[in-house]
Design a protein with these regions (language model features):
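C-terminal and inter-domain tail/linker signature
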Residues: 1-348
Length: 348
């Protein structure tokens, strides 16, 4: 089922009713931006206990981790590896339901210097830039479920490591080649509100369910304004035509790929609509394309995309999927020694 919710956009907007939340938060966007700043920029790790559910479920890559201690451990390790990390909140697209539960999709651009050791090796001293999109389900001042997608391929490459060799060292998926099919629960916890989609949501559904399915560059380009720009993984910016070629290359790596749109959330402004789409790719690594060298391994990848729509066409897009995690799945049984789901790679 695709869950679609539409809300007016609050950035520095009016005070919002937040049942069960700390009174210092003006609205749900303020909540997301404030706790991100206080935890990461001000390094107030203790705030995690107040803003994350004790039994939080976190989806990242093909893995699921549980418990607030996982968040704390990963945050401490990330800050040790990148102590000067700066996180710029580019957008928060949100919605709410009648129970007082909120859903947010937070796009973050980060700069950081690798001053401490990482799971991959010794500190490199290199400066990096990467994007993350975190979808959160929130109630009573606590995030209780999170879908985290970070451009880890960009991080590994900028640090100077070989992504394939590093993927072979990941031990988390060893012996779990069936992980992509059936192990991972796909039910959304608590998100029951569903609204009739507007033309803007229909445009995004059409992009994924028709243009991607047809694997047609021409059909995909019809959804975009002529001067549109797409911010893709590996810190690459594409035109609509160039991005259509990239998507085709991605899909060619999985000839039987199935794309499922799990959730759409939109915020309407005066002259534009911002839409967040969380989607799932499942398929067998069996072609050429972006992930060359067919292995026959079943793979899954969570993707999150943000769109700006004006005049019925996409003018700007940000799409993140963890291509490094896909490499880890492809090379799952190569005798890895790095526990990435327990490392700094498992948090925002």
């Amino acid at each position: 089922m695709i869950h679609i919710e539409t809300s007016e956009y609050h950035w520095n907007g009016p005070i919002q009713n937040l049942p069960g939340f700390d009174k210092k938060y003006k609205n749900i966007v303020d909540y997301i931006l404030t706790i991100t700043d206080e935890i990461w920029e001000q390094k107030d790790i203790s705030l995690i206990y107040d803003t994350y559910d004790e039994n939080i479920i976190i989806h990242h890559g093909a893995a699921i981790t549980k418990g607030v201690q996982t968040v704390i451990d990963g945050t401490i390790k990330m800050l040790a590896s990148f102590p000067d990390r700066k996180m710029h909140g580019e957008a928060v697209i949100w919605s709410a339901d009648e129970r007082g539960h909120f859903y947010s999709s937070h796009r973050i651009a980060s700069t950081a210097t690798n001053k401490g050791d990482t799971a991959f090796g010794k500190a490199t001293g290199k400066q990096i830039f990467f994007r993350t999109i975190a979808d959160c389900a929130i109630a009573n001042n606590e995030i209780y479920e999170e879908w985290l997608v970070r451009d880890n391929l960009a991080i590994v490459e900028q640090l100077g490591f070989d992504p394939v060799e590093m993927a072979k060292r990941n031990r988390d998926y060893s012996g779990k080649k069936s992980l992509a099919y059936g192990v991972r629960p796909r039910q959304l916890n608590g998100h029951q509100s569903q609204y009739d989609q507007s033309k803007d949501e229909e445009l995004i559904l059409s992009l994924f369910l028709h243009a991607w399915k047809a694997r047609s560059e021409e059909e995909r380009c019809r959804h975009y304004a002529p001067d549109s720009i797409i911010h893709a993984i590996q810190n690459k910016d594409h035109t609509a035509a160039a991005n259509a070629s990239f998507v085709l290359s991605l899909l060619n790596s999985f000839p039987d790929a199935v794309i499922t749109v799990e959730r759409l959330t939109s915020n309407k402004g005066k002259n534009r609509t911002e839409v967040a789409a969380r989607w799932l790719l499942t398929g067998t690594h069996g072609g050429s394309g972006f992930f060359a060298g067919a292995s026959g391994v079943p793979v899954m990848a969570i993707g999150i995309s943000h769109f700006i729509i004006k005049g019925g066409l996409i003018t700007e897009e940000w799409t993140i999927l963890d291509a490094f995690d896909v490499l880890c799945q492809i090379h799952a049984d190569t005798g890895g020694d790095i526990p990435l789901t327990e490392s700094e790679m498992s948090v925002e």
